[in-house]
């Protein structure tokens, strides 16, 4: 059993279901209501994270970059040992990530970035970022790495790459503001025009960041 962040747990039954006959399957297929297609990002059926993962897979397959999503750390709470040589995790929880979502290498440069999404139309809430992530990105920049955030405005269907230096500056000089204005992101960031393949061509902008280092 694994406890997910929303507190729900998932278990699976090992008892096989009764096989249906061909006639039963045919009748069920005809009577089943047609389901609506899932649309979560840009009306293409993918959410923001899936778009980024697909883009990274494309870059890897073309030998352009090696960038992966960092696994979410898990806190193991209970382990059973049904046999001496075999351990079974029976209870575990997802822990809060300590750094950012993605990291890798591009043209000899270390790349590190966070990806966030909002349904707000004029601002991006700062509550989406934790101070330890801001500190981590500051440390990456101090080592001459490439650090940034990908910000997706779902309702506007707009995606921006904001260099971490601008996020860090705003985070510590926000003057009581709880959100980053979209105008600030547009002024200091780069709008990403989504494609079919790759989905989110952010390396085109990373090239520019490499040039100014």
Curated annotation (Swiss-Prot):
It is found in: Cytoplasm. Gene3D superfamilies: 3.40.1350.10. Coiled coil: none annotated. Its cofactor is Mg(2+). Binds 1 Mg(2+) ion per subunit. GO terms for molecular function: endonuclease activity; magnesium ion binding; nucleic acid binding. It catalyses: Endonucleolytic cleavage at a junction such as a reciprocal single-stranded crossover between two homologous DNA duplexes (Holliday junction). It is an enzyme of class 3 (hydrolase). GO terms for cellular component: cytoplasm. Pfam families: RecU (PF03838). Mg(2+) binds at residues 99, 101, 114, 133. The record marks 116 as: Transition state stabilizer. Belongs to the RecU family. Endonuclease that resolves Holliday junction intermediates in genetic recombination. Cleaves mobile four-strand junctions by introducing symmetrical nicks in paired strands. Promotes annealing of linear ssDNA with homologous dsDNA. Required for DNA repair, homologous recombination and chromosome segregation. NCBIfam families: PRK02234.1-1, PRK02234.1-5, recU. This is Holliday junction resolvase RecU. The gene is recU.
């Amino acid at each position: 059993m694994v406890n997910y962040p929303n507190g729900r747990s998932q278990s699976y039954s090992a008892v096989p279901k009764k096989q249906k006959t061909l006639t039963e399957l045919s009748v069920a297929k005809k009577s089943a209501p047609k389901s609506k297609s899932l649309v979560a990002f840009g009306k293409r059926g993918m959410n923001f994270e899936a778009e980024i993962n697909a883009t990274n897979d494309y870059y890897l397959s073309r030998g352009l970059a090696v960038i992966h999503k960092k696994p979410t750390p898990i806190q193991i709470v209970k382990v059973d040992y049904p046999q001496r040589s075999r351990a079974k995790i029976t209870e575990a929880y997802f822990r809060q990530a300590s750094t950012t979502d993605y990291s890798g290498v591009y043209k000899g440069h270390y790349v590190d970035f966070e990806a966030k999404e909002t349904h707000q139309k004029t601002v991006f809430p700062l509550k989406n970022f934790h101070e330890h992530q801001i500190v981590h990105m500051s440390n990456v920049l101090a080592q001459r790495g490439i650090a940034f955030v990908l910000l997706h405005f779902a309702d506007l269907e707009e995606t921006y790459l904001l260099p971490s230096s601008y996020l860090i500056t705003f985070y510590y000089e926000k003057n009581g503001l709880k959100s980053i204005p979209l105008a600030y992101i547009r002024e200091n960031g780069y709008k990403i025009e989504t494609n079919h393949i790759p989905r989110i061509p952010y390396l085109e902008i990373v090239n520019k960041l490499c040039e100014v280092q």
